[in-house]
């Protein structure tokens, strides 16, 4: 049997490789989506506050954002993963609370320009509630860049989960993830004689990340057609 029969293959302890691969893909997507939602919500809230109010609030929030971004990203993730108990929900929360600074800076930049527009000033003069101005007037006009940026955050989160699980600091066995499936294929014997243990999860990591980046490119072109033309 060749590699094409991966759906019939088993690992060293008799677990079906194809079933575990399908489950691992679901875990990777779950981590990517939930971590992106958490980081996006945090970044949007902080970016709205910093951009709209300015002054001391802007200075404090942006200095805190700069401080978080000044740490090497992968080192920050590794330290957080080492502190907390490894597991699915731990890695989702860690990635969600580490990936928000980019979203916050993006939203703040958009809010700084939008708050000077006539339709926002008109709402302020009309005495509209702050909640309405932020979430009904300003936020909808920042959705497009947020969605585009969120796709890159999702791809990075999935890569980070795979890396941490490979190192034994992410999703723990017996739960399958693409990273810990690769973790079980480190010996030369497995690499050379049992490629069905490591090649399918490796390929799926590449396919998922590239596909999400393609979605991000398509969203960018859809929201800004003129910007995508050469």
Please give the residue ranges for each predicted region.
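Short, small-residue-biased leader/transition segments that mark boundaries at the very start
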Residues: 1-7
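Alpha-helical transmembrane segments of integral membrane proteins
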Residues: 10-230
């Amino acid at each position: 049997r060749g590699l094409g029969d991966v759906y019939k293959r088993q690992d060293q302890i008799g677990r079906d490789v194809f079933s575990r691969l399908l489950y691992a893909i679901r875990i990777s997507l779950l981590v990517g989506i939930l971590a992106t939602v958490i980081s996006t919500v945090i970044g949007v809230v902080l970016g709205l506050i910093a951009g709209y109010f300015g002054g001391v609030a802007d200075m404090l929030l942006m200095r805190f954002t700069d401080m978080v971004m000044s740490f090497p990203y992968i080192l920050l993730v590794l330290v957080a993963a080492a502190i907390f108990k490894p597991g699915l929900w731990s890695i989702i929360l860690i990635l969600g609370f580490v990936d928000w600074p980019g979203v916050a800076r993006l939203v703040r930049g958009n809010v700084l320009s939008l708050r000077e527009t006539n339709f926002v000033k008109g709402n302020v003069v009309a005495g509209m509630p702050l909640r309405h101005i932020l979430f009904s007037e300003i936020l909808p006009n920042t959705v497009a860049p947020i969605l585009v940026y969120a796709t890159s955050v999702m791809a990075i989160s999935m890569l980070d989960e795979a890396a941490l699980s490979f190192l034994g600091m992410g999703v723990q066995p017996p739960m399958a993830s693409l990273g810990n499936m690769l973790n079980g294929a480190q010996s030369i014997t497995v690499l050379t004689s049992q490629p069905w243990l490591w090649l399918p999860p490796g390929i799926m990591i590449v396919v998922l990340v590239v596909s999400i980046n393609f979605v991000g490119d398509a969203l960018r072109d859809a929201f800004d057609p003129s910007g995508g033309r050469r």
